Each structure stands twice: as C-alpha cells, then as structure tokens.
A protein has these predicted regions:
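Active-site HxH/HxHxD metal-binding segment of metal-dependent hydrolases
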Residues: 1-51, 151-167
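C-terminal regulatory/interaction regions
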Residues: 163-179
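Context-gated lysine
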Residues: 11, 16, 21, 38, ...
Length: 179
C-alpha cells in the first residue's frame, strides 16, 4: 500500500501476484501513480527472491501476507536487518487493509501466514527489526500518541520475534471473539 508515485522510478519490485493484478487491470492500483503516470518496469518477487542492492549487499524476500494480501518483508544478512513495513503490527495493533466483511477471513489467513513465518523469524532473532512506522513500537493508544510524538513516551515495545508470537495470539483472540 506504500507505493504512491511509483511511476517516478525506473524499476519497481512488487509481489508477483500484484504484478499480475496490474497486468489484468492497470487501474487496480491507480493511486500508486501520479496524474498521467505510467507503471515503470515491474520486477515480480516472491518468497525466496533475492534483490541485489549493489556492493555485495542483497535482501531476501519473505512472504508475510496480512497487512495486504501480498505483503512481504526483506531480510538483509549483510547488515543483520529485517524490514517489515506494516506486515507485523506491534503486539498492540494489527495493521490490515481489507473490507470489514472480509475481516475474519483475512485474520485467519494472517494468523496462518504468521505461523508459517515463525520458523524463519527464529533465524532472524538477532537482526534489527524495522517496521513501517516508528509509532508501532510506541503504542498506538491515542491518549499517548502526543507523548510519543513529543519524544517522552514511556511505552516501548520494539519489533522482534516475540511480537510475531504475540500477533498470532492476538489474531486467535480476535477470531474467537475473546477480544
């Protein structure tokens, strides 16, 4: 969902299923383009794809659908960094884009995807995990957002393996109606 103005790039890496959607309907991600913009060269990626950043640095693509159907995360062994975007919430919230009527179906799919990701995440335990929004790590409670924005938040829950485990539990509790 963070692909606004992708037409300003020569080449864009995008999950293979989203590339296929664009090929079938160029308007499916119309908000991604500037007015009158055209899609750049789209490079399909999927679980196991490796993107060469140059200088001997690569990132491995790991599927983690949920925030969007085809969300991915990127692991960089060179810098021991995992870039999760919005694919992993914070243990406090689940960041998903779906119609409300599809919420439980998407939650069940997200839970399954998190469970599949867990064994891979174990190998990334000692990596630095970077989310899409720093507020994810500082709680999203509206009463405390101003504290976070002012740099005086007392809540800090950095993204890490345990958050993935917490998100599985959170999904289950939402699915069963416990919360």
């Amino acid at each position: 969902d963070h692909m606004f103005r992708i037409d300003r790039f020569e080449k864009v890496y995008l999950h293979k299923n989203d590339v296929e959607k664009i090929r079938e309907d160029e308007n499916c991600f119309a908000a991604a383009l500037s007015d009158g913009g055209k899609y750049p060269h789209l490079v399909p990626i999927d679980e196991g794809s490796v993107i060469d950043l140059g200088g001997g640095v690569t990132v491995d693509v790991l599927n983690l659908g949920g925030h969007t159907e085809n969300s991915v995360v990127f692991a960089c062994a060179h810098y021991k960094a995992l870039f999760t975007g919005d694919a992993i919430g914070s243990g406090y919230i689940i960041l998903m884009i779906c119609p409300e009527k599809d919420m439980y179906k998407v939650l069940e799919s997200y839970k399954k995807n998190l469970e599949c990701f867990l064994p891979r995440a174990e190998a990334l335990r000692d990596y630095a995990w970077f989310g899409g929004h720093s507020i994810q790590e500082n709680g999203c409670d509206e009463q405390h957002q101003q504290d976070y924005l002012a740099g005086r938040s007392v809540y800090y829950n950095p993204l890490r393996l345990e958050i993935v485990q917490d998100m599985v539990v959170l999904c289950e509790k939402l699915i069963t109606g416990e919360i």
